[in-house]
């Protein structure tokens, strides 16, 4: 897949979204 993370403003949330995309959930 492709890792799609939208910048919400906080780097913590960004990493969290990226992690979820990586996990595939």
Swiss-Prot record:
Catalyzed reactions: diphosphate + H2O = 2 phosphate + H(+)
Keyword Magnesium belongs to the record: yes
Cofactor requirement: Mg(2+)
Keywords attached to this entry: Hydrolase, Magnesium, Metal-binding
A molecular function (GO) term: metal ion binding
Keyword Zinc-finger: no
EC number, as in UniProt: 3.6.1.1
Subunit structure: Monomer.
Family to which the UniProt record says this protein belongs: Belongs to the PPase family.
Name this polypeptide is given: Inorganic pyrophosphatase
Organism listed in the record: Cyanophora paradoxa
Lineage: Eukaryota, Glaucocystophyceae, Cyanophoraceae, Cyanophora
